[in-house]
Every structure is written in structure tokens, then in C-alpha cells.
Amino acid sequence: TRTRINGIEAQASTGATDSSGGVNRGRGFDFNVFASELFNNITVRKTSSAEVEEGSLGATVDLRTSRPFDKMGFQGALSGQYGYNDLSEDWSPRFAGLISNTWADDQLGALFSIAYSERESLEEGFSSVRWGPASADGGFQNGSVLPSPSTTYHPRIPRYGSLEHGQERLGATLSLQARPGNGPTLFTLDMLYSKLDSTRSENFLQAWSLSRGADQGGKPQVDIVDFAIDPDTGEMTYARLDDMDIRSEQRFDVLETEFKQMTFAVEHEFSDRLRFNGLIGRAESSFGNPVQVSAIIDRQNVDGYSYDFRENRNLPAINWGFDVTDPAQWSIVGPTGAQPRSELRSSANFQDNVYTTGEANFAFELSERLTLKAGVSRKEYESSSRAFARLANGAPALPAGVTMADVTDLRTGFGKNLDLPAGAATSWIRPDLEALQTVWDYRCNCDTGVAGGDFRLVGLNGNPSTYGNWREVTETVTGGFVQADWNLEIMGLPVRGNVGVRQVKTEVEALGYSNVGGVATPVTGQNEYEDTLPSLNVAIEPMEDLIVRFGAAKVMSRPPVTSLVPVFALSAVNASSNTASLGNVELEPYRAKTYDLSVEYY
């Protein structure tokens, strides 16, 4: 699905949790950047036609902001909401306003609208972080007690999660229209602005050992004390384990998206039969995740840990094996301690997307029943990504005299409306990021000189872990179409539709960076390809209130941006699951032949 705003393709990006995809570095459109009040109408094109730009295997969604000539004269509107979320226990204000007027016998018009909202939400639940085979990561210390370790599966990181989301959104539109002398020419200038500022605090209580190898103090050190396996699925639905490593994590993100778009459109009627419309426009989306910090504290080698899915597949009973609310039971394992060592992760991510579009289209009515259309277009898409991170995620040891109680706090109230199993933890100790800032000064972007205290955020100038997220892709698309629209009666039945063909050429340039001896080495690539895309759409009304629709087309969708950069990447050689990836600027687009048939009754 492709999204256009005021006639041109656009992209708005933001960031999600890691489990939901993280930073949007692809072609996806994040609708939550905008308030719905900013738009006057939405059109969903479920089938392709030659006059509509290519780029989607399915639908095209067209959004349009309000314009003064939508309703002549002075107009105004104001709305407000004040909602309450009983889970986050917070109020969420929202308001929108619009003012519009036309002058000079409706030859000139201006419209301004604004929308503002705040929202606090809470997300809680259990996550397995996927299931893995018991034989992975070196297997259990006494894995032979299992009948078939390779076909027995357990949760990789069983954990409770509590996520707090904060959101502030401001959007505005300005539209100016002119029809000089109330004549055949209409000029429209549309401007759209939106700013989404978000924060997210993620809190996790998690069992760590089941997804790590021996080098990280993982599964090969864990003893199976008792277990139960579902014979139908091979899932280890219950396990009691000794020597488990338990972790508590707090992560905090600051996320900022700014979207700006301007389009200028001209419509002109040369005669009753010949019409022209054209537009130029630019849409810019800038996303920043300048703060992404996670602190992780540990309790190593816990005996008596257990999980049990037998009563509830989605929400197991978990016994953590110790008092998770006592700060003295937790520790920060410094650079010289046993694995797994505690962590202070810090990074920053940025993504910019720009669309620049121009098009010109003509329509000529051969008769009341038949209209011929033709047009040309040119579009440039630029995607730029950057990332910075610490060189190593290890945490420093606590200074002398600083206790765990000084750098932690108690997360309380977990599990509202979750119907947790009896005895489940509803509170636990978590790292206190502000207290750790006071102790470690991790926001300094500097090397403090203590072991584990290098808090510099490094990108292309020496941090290979970030190289894969430094890339630039430019696509230049030149296209044209011809199309015939008809509105006929055949044997007394209304028949309307269109048939046409679109020809498009795509030119791609990609830049990425490979790790050559620890040095970021630029790698570039170019490609171009052409597509011929015919389409047919027919709608027949065999009887009143009944419409039968048929569509057939060749369609194409361009490859993911992240796959176009010609860079080879390899996971750590000693990692439990080694992976390699290679981008390819010469990837062809996804191509398909689509057929649609629908019957609609009104």
C-alpha cells in the first residue's frame, strides 16, 4: 500500500519498540504522525489505473487536506476532547480548529487549520521473545534428561514488560486558492506541517540464560530440575531450572518526527473539451531518536526459577527464585565480573526521507461518453540514515560507597487487568536512569577514564556496529501514461471504466559503508530498470443499487530501501547464531499481475 498526500507520494517515519520493528528505515508510512482532523477526505484506490503512479502491489491511499473553495464564504470549526485512560491513570487533551474565507466574489480563498493532542498510555504483558530449541546455544548442562533436545522448544527470554508511552503532536495546514476572474484557471497552494514528539520508557523483568551460550554464562550452565513437554507441539510448557541469570532493564527513548510538505497545483480548462492539471511538490520527513539508553542489572545463578504455561498459554506463572523487590538481591556486574555483565547501552538514530515530484496531465473529451487522458511525471526519492552508539555496552562498577539502593527504584503496579496467576510479581527493582546519570555521567558523550566508562557515541569514525545504518539511497523515476475513460450503456446497462498503460523508468543510486579492518569504507552502486504497466477497470450496473467491478493490471513495487545498499555484513563470528547479509542495488522490483472482482450492493 502506498500513501499520497495532496497528490504526491510522501513518507512519514517514526520509531517503535525493537519487537515492533524499531526505527522505520524503509518505505512504510507511519500514520500516527498526523492528526486525522487535518484531512478533509481520504480515497482508497483498490485497483490500479494508468493515471495513478506506480509503486504498490495493492491499494493506493490518497489523503487531502481542506481547501477554502471546498465551501465558499467564511467558515469556522472548533473541536475538543478530554479523555481519561484508566490504565495509565492520565488525562489526554485533544483539540482542533479551522478557519476559512473567500474574497473578491470567491476568486480568492485562504484556509488555516490546526490540531494538537497529548497522550499517555501504558502497555503491559508477557513476552517469550520467540521460542527456540533446547539444543541451541550449546544446550542445557544436563540436556540429556530431555527426550529430544533438538525438537523440544522453550521461551528464549521469558519476561514481564511494562511500557509507558508519552506523545505530544502538533499539526497545521495552510491552503491558498485563486481563480482569477472566476475564469478557467485554478491555482492551489497547500502546505502541511506536523510535529510528533514522543517518549517511551520500557521496563523488563526477564530470564536471560535461555538465549545465550557459554561465553555469556548462558544455557550450558543451567540445570533442568523438572519439566513438562506438550507431546503435540514439542513445547516445554513447564520448567524448573537452577543456575539461571535474571535481569532487570529500564530503557528510555526520545523520538522526534517533523514532517513538512508543500504542493502547488494548476488546473486549466482550454475549452469545454480540453483540460490540464499539473503540480509540483516536495515532502520532507525528518526522524530523530537522539536518546536511546538502556540500563541492565543482574542477579546471577538463581536456583528455583520456574515458568509454567500449562494453565495459561499466553500468561505463564513465573517463580523468579528470589525476592525481586529487594535491591540487595541485585548487583551491577562490572567489566571484570563474571558473565553476563551488566550493561549501559546508549545510541542515537536518525532517518530522513524526501520526495520531490512534478507532473503534467491532459484530458480531452472526444464525446460525452469517451475521454482520452495523457500525462508525464518525474519523482525523486531520497532516503538517508545515520546511527551512533557506544563502542562497548558494558557498565562500570559502582564507585565505593554507592549501593544498589542508591541507583535503583521499585517499579510497582504491574499487571492491571491482566489477570495474573496467583503469586505473580507485580513489583520489581529496576535501574534508575537518573540516579545512574548522577553516578556515571553517561550523557557526557565522553570517556570518563574509568573501566567501562567510555560513553562516547561513535558512528562512521570508528564504530563498526553502526556502519550498516549509515546509508543513502536516491531513486529517480520518470514516467508517462495514456488512458481512455468511458461511460456507456450497453444493452441498457450502465458500463463505465478505463483502460490504459503506464511506462516508467527507475534509476537508483545507493551508498553504504563496509567494515574494512575497522574502517568505514564507502561502497556505491547504480541500477536502472523499466516497466510497462497496462491496466483495465470495468464497472457494470446490472440492476439498481448493484455494481459488479472487475480490474486487471500489471503492477510493481520497488525493493526495500535497506536491501539496496551494496554492503556485506556478518554477525560476530563467535555468536550463537551467525548470520550474513548482502545488499544488492541491482534488485529488481516486485512485479505481479493482479485480477480483482467484486460485487457491491447498496
Q: In which residue ranges do the predicted regions lie?
A:
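Outer-membrane beta-barrel translocator/receptor signature
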Residues: 12, 21-29, 37-44, 51-144, ...
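Extracytoplasmic beta-strand/coil segments of soluble accessory domains associated
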Residues: 1-17, 46
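Outer-membrane beta-barrel and related beta-rich outer-membrane complex signature
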Residues: 15-17, 119-131, 188-223, 243-247, ...
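Outer/extracellular conduits and scaffolds centered on Gram-negative outer-membrane beta-barrels
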Residues: 404, 410-412, 416, 420, ...
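Extended hydrophobic/aromatic segments used for targeting, binding, or gating
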Residues: 224-226, 294-314, 506-538
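Flexible glycine-rich, low-complexity coil/linker segments exposed to the extracellular/periplasmic environment
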Residues: 137-155, 219-244, 305-341, 397-469
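Outer-membrane beta-barrel domain signature, especially the mid-to-C-terminal portions
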Residues: 202, 304-306, 512, 520-527, ...
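Outer-membrane beta-barrel transmembrane strands
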Residues: 59-65, 81-82, 91-102, 157-202, ...
